[in-house]
Amino acid sequence: MKRIKTPAGLAALLLAGTCLTAPLALPSLALAEVTADGTTTEASPLTPAVAGVTAPKDFFPQEPGTDYYLANYTQYEAYLKLLDQQSDRMKLESFGTTEEGRTQWMAIVSTPENLANLERYKDIARRLAKAEGVSEDEARQLAAEGKAVVWIDAGLHATETVTTQGQVHVLYRLLTGQDAETQRTLNDTILLFGHVNPDGLELVADWYMRKDKPEERSFRDIPRLYQKYTGHDNNRDSYMVTQAETENVNRIHYREWFPQIVYNQHQTGPRGMVVFIPPFRDPFNYNLDSLVMTTTNELGTAMHSRLVSEGKGGSGADTVASYSTWHNGMVRSTPYYHNAVGILTEIIGGPTPEDIALVPEHQLARSDLPLPIAPRKWHLRDSIDYQWSMNRAVIDYAARNRERVLFNMWRMGMNGIERGSTDTWQITPSDVDRLRAAGGEGQRGAVDAGLMASVIRTSENREARGYIINPETQRDLPASVAFLNTLIKNGVDVEVAERPFTVNGTRYPAGSYVVKTAQAYRPHVLDMFEPQDHPHNTDYPGGPPKLPYDVAGYTLAYQMGVNFDRIQDGFEAPTTKATDILSAPAGRVIGSGRAGYVIGHEANNSFILTNRLLAAGIKPEWISQSVRANGETLGAGAIWVPASEQATAIVREAVGPLGIDAHAVARRPAGDGMALKPVRVGLVDRYGGVMSSGWTRWLLEQYEFPFEVVYPKALDTEDLNAKYDVLVFTDTAAPTLSYAGYRNGGAWSQPAPETVPDEMRGWLGEVTAETTVPRIAEFARKGGTVVTIGNSNRLAHLLGAPIEPALVNNENGRVTPLATTDFFLPGSVLSASVETTNPLAYGMPEQADVFFSNGQTFRVTGEGAKTVVTFDSENPLRSGWAHHPERLKDTAAVVDVDLGEGKVFAYGAEVTQRAQPHGTFRLFFNGLLYGPASAGRE
């Protein structure tokens, strides 16, 4: 058999990936299968060449789909540009740049005639999606004229390599296919092929290909997160929209193109199978239009049927995996709240061949596994073959059901408008519990039908017609505006009052914000303002709770500390719709005093101003008691800035854009002051990247805190007090530490040092009890501040803080975490009491919403520890799911601990989780400044 030597080195990859600029019509070459000695043997090509358009095998160094080969984004991008030149079925458009500055490309594929009329079809999609002002007759006319718009993405999770490698084949086949199905489907659809993580593909592919010997290639030991800040959590950002890539995708989905189907491709499939395809397991979110769920199930079933008809076994659905439609915020789930079908597939495979495992029960056909697959060797090309079939199934469904898909988008949007214009009631698990309690033991499970009116359909239980945000009652107005901007970035209509108005006897000023539920994206509006009520899911009565796929409660208005009025009756207001992203009302300098400036502590943006002042060598103070300034009362922690030419310039330049007021006063406010000092923050990370650390890195950058990333080796060897004032250990930053009452994390696998480039070897290592903990304790005793969050609170205990975990069993001195049957609280929003006179809580309200996720709370056991945030009720649940929430009562969620001359701040509540809870950011930010300011106290 003929042997072909593979190209070696990244330089060869880049050269080969960009040198081809003209179409080739070459004889069909073999798809390379690489042997252990680095040579390849011929096999049938995945995609044969067609004259006029360059085939993948003729462009890339090796055909994508070859064992032990990955194309990177540079090559992928170059190939898209070439296809754009060669085919009249494709139009290539940039839809933004990534966090690392790469261009995100979207290949729009359809017939030449459709591509010539994209603006018309885009307008049809928009009008049907938004529904407002479109009658049913007009909707049917538009649906008859329009084209189904389908989004198919690749590469969101960069180590899930099948999707990008397969997408080049999908594109080529669609651009060159002359078969009846291709021509029919392209005529009836507009296909949007987007790459959603270019930075990650470049990192992962280059890392994988860096070794010459194919069998040594791996991407399991990549050195950092494959999205600059969020890693795998780039698929948890869709409602918050913090990252550039998320904003780019959301703009296409909800503000420009409004696809009716969003197909988000992932890995990996269930063990002993090939691919997960919907239908999903329950629960589905109660805010969703039922039609979006039935259509998602319908399309998923069509995908299974296509695979089965082609003899491709191993597709599973429903309970074969944990995926559900409960959680908003993912690329495929946020579409549900916008009346679009969201398809997730999770397929096995990668450039390194693998084996399908033999799982005995998966050899028996059933409704959620219609065609089992036997154990066998599996190659990347096999996954790409399945990907082509699944893509074809989605496209064919959209084409065959074009008018229905388009019209149903309007129907669901109009449902939202109509439901938001009348009295409606949503049934949740809590309502079912109330019906059961009111009905007693009903015959065959039924209760008195009259209870529907007396228990459920009461006036006070009606769903909201809208929400009003009064700018004058916000503790942190810029954060509230940021919340509104997340809605706008998700296509929600937000209105701004042009003049004062009154609703239900309450007077609202001009500039108030109104979000009505009578709009197409009503499900998303409700999901962001209203509490999630997750069912109590168990396999059997009294059994352990079943873990949700992601968090159970996440109401964003609660997390961001937004004060809003929930209006249950129809109302009108003199408003105009916001046409783009809002800016917070400009802050002002109030008063004419010359001694200095007083700024409230309530707005997170005050930390940006503080950090700018500190960077300029100016040292503000926090005043320990409330302050009166120009007729306003500012709470404890108000910021005092003595006047100077430099300070005045910084304050006056900053307050306007930051949306915070500064009071110019004639004398320093009375009361004790805490002088702040410049801080040097060390943010602890690990080789491979810790997602919570990445999110925190993004957060620190937004609020202009100076910081460095520090790794375990440096913690073990450097003079920590000479380099840092604060060390931050986010959740999972120290997974090898153990402490009674916590579930063990365990070590993450790390590569051998000699296999890692020199500049990255310092990233290796672990935080250990034997070496690292004593050095961190010494750092704190000498005046350093240690911040621990989530599971990293094990470190706080090991440092000797006089606190103990509260959510534990203690049997004969043996302390263990509570079993899930005794306490279970997957990511949810809880209400907590705050000690606002503690500097750690300056700027906080006395009662606050905090995010908590199956973590640990504390009991203070000795002097030197102060409780700052407490769960003070039998059931603090605000949004989500809590099993035995009474276990939390009177336990501490945040504690302030003295340790020698330094501080330890332990956060059981996840006060920064995924950069969402703006309402608790200041608990974290305060710690970064308060600890160093109090260091060396008597």
Describe these PLM feature segments.
Residues 2-14:
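Bacterial N-terminal signal peptides that target proteins for export
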Residues 11, 22-25, 394:
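Intrinsic disorder/low-complexity detector
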Residues 17-29:
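C-terminal segment of classical bacterial N-terminal signal peptides
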Residues 33-189, 230, 236-237, 242-244, ...:
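Intrinsic-disorder/low-complexity accessory segments
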Residues 189-236:
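Divalent-metal coordination cores built from histidine and acidic residues
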Residues 193-197, 208, 264-272, 792:
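Short, solvent-exposed turn/loop segments enriched in Gly/Ser/Thr/Pro and often Arg
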Residues 199-200, 269-271, 351, 735:
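Feature marks short, surface-exposed loop/turn motifs that line or immediately flank catalytic pockets
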Residues 271, 328-329:
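Hydrophobic, helix-prone linear segments
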